[in-house]
Amino acid sequence: MSKKLFFVLLIVSITSYATKPHVTSVKADTEKSYVYWRGNEVGGFHDGNIKLKSGYIISDHGKLVGGKFIIDMNTITNLDIKSEKYSQKLVNHLKDDHFFDVDKFPTSMLIIKNAKKISDQNYNITADLTVRGITNEINFISNVRIRGNQFQAEGDIVIDRTKWDVKYRSSIIGTVADKLIEDNIEF
């Protein structure tokens, strides 16, 4: 009788644990966290980093379920141009109203609305991305490792910048082909 009772209690205990939410919020380390960006143009590309201002993920039983990241657009950098003068010229151009209009919109935001686990550490993520005050839904695959109060996330996001009103030298406005900057930006 006691063995049967123990087994029943064990099943109830396991079932109870499995259905009880265990939601945890883990803050991003803004000193180590950044967004890598890459934009392509005819004959080449530019790339760089942008720092996070703040951010966190939400997990339930160690699985990603949500999150929010504030991106500090004032910290945008360039990596590919070696001349400091020309690198800074590009950064200033990216900050002006042709691109991210950083004076008006100093931050961008990514809010994870849904994260579906597709393999051990990979998730299909649906999120709202706000750039220049315009919000659009995006989908991407991300590799997320959660260990206690630490996490590491990597993923490739490709967006059509024109959906966020970044149309400088875009193909949709009839730019001459040799001056064209691709509409897609990679993060």
For every predicted segment, state its role:
Residues 17-187:
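Low-complexity, acidic/polar, glycine-enriched regions of mature
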